[in-house]
């Protein structure tokens, strides 16, 4: 049996995607619509307080295209905290006008493919802690997609030796390093949590960088032979103080 990669796991992650039911929302009187938007704003401003205590983080983006209108991404120390957030969100009046289109449950993950040998406790390493328990950037754009490592009769990632996988992941990582300063990447593991094995969340102030890195990695052996991908979601940041304009209907 091939040796399994060890992982370091950080905050639990929940991506929630919604489409706005504009037709129904249009029937709501303006004063009532303003009230439910204000309630939504207050909810998200309250959940965002974890950032200052370094006990979680969140991001809100307006998704481009018809897959969704809004992405709410929450990071928390415990899975049950994500349940609480989702349950409380569903009780908001605005939730009656937001149609769930997709969700993804995972946990911030670092693998040991590229790690050197050390007796140090990795969870005490400041660099590693910053990656496992991150402060999310307020970049203009976000890109999210789920992925698997292929396992079929021809190409099976899980039948490769540890040394083979380490070599492939090293080459793969070298491409990613070319985009340092342009893209911020977060990998979340989801084996046993969701339908794919990993979620990839990218941040950048230049949306074109998403296309460039994904295209370049198509030629990398790790992706070309072993990568399988779900849907891609791309969007622009939206702040809670922009909600009145976003939900405004003339």
From Swiss-Prot:
Sorted UniProt keywords: Heme, Heme biosynthesis, Iron, Metal-binding, Oxidoreductase
Catalytic residues, chain numbering: 145
InterPro entries given in the database record: CHDC, ChdC/CLD, Dimeric_a/b-barrel
Keyword Membrane part of the UniProt annotation: no
Superkingdom of this protein's organism: Bacteria
Co-factor requirement: Fe-coproporphyrin III
One GO MF term: peroxidase activity
Cofactor-binding details, from the entry: Fe-coproporphyrin III acts both as a substrate and a redox cofactor.
Keyword Oxidoreductase: yes
E.C. numbers: 1.3.98.5
Substrates-to-products reaction catalysed: Fe-coproporphyrin III + 2 H2O2 + 2 H(+) = heme b + 2 CO2 + 4 H2O; Fe-coproporphyrin III + H2O2 + H(+) = harderoheme III + CO2 + 2 H2O; harderoheme III + H2O2 + H(+) = heme b + CO2 + 2 H2O
GO biological process, alphabetically ordered: heme B biosynthetic process
Residues the entry annotates as binding Fe-coproporphyrin III: 131, 145-149, 172, 185
Recorded metabolic or biological pathway in which this protein acts: Porphyrin-containing compound metabolism; protoheme biosynthesis
Similarity annotation: Belongs to the ChdC family. Type 1 subfamily.
Classification via HAMAP family: Coproheme_decarbox_1
NCBIfam families with a match to the protein in the record: PRK12276.1
Record function comment: Involved in coproporphyrin-dependent heme b biosynthesis. Catalyzes the decarboxylation of Fe-coproporphyrin III (coproheme) to heme b (protoheme IX), the last step of the pathway. The reaction occurs in a stepwise manner with a three-propionate intermediate.
Protein name per UniProt: Coproheme decarboxylase
Species of origin: Staphylococcus aureus (strain MRSA252)
């Amino acid at each position: 049996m091939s040796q399994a990669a060890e992982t370091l796991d950080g905050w639990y992650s929940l991506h929630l995607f919604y489409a706005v039911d504009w037709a129904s929302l249009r029937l709501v009187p303006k004063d009532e619509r303003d009230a439910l938007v204000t309630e939504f704003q207050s909810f998200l401003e309250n959940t965002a307080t974890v950032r200052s205590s370094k006990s979680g983080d969140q991001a809100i983006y307006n998704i481009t295209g018809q897959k969704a209108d809004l992405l709410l991404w929450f990071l928390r120390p415990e899975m049950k905290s994500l349940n609480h957030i989702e349950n409380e969100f569903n009780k908001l009046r605005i939730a009656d006008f937001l149609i769930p289109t997709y969700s993804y449950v995972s946990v911030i993950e670092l693998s040991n493919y590229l790690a050197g040998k050390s007796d140090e406790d990795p969870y005490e390493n400041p660099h590693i802690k910053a990656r496992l328990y991150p402060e999310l950037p307020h970049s203009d754009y976000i890109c999210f997609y789920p992925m698997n490592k292929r396992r079929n009769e021809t190409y099976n990632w899980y039948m490769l030796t540890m040394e083979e996988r380490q070599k492939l992941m090293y080459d793969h990582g070298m491409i990613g390093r070319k985009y340092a300063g342009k893209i911020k990447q977060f990998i979340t593991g989801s084996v046993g949590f969701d339908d794919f094995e990993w979620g990839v969340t990218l941040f950048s102030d230049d949306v074109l960088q998403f296309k460039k890195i994904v295209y370049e990695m198509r030629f990398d052996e790790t992706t070309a032979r072993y990568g399988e991908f779900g849907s891609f979601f791309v969007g622009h940041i939206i702040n809670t103080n922009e909600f009145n304009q976003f939900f405004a209907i003339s």
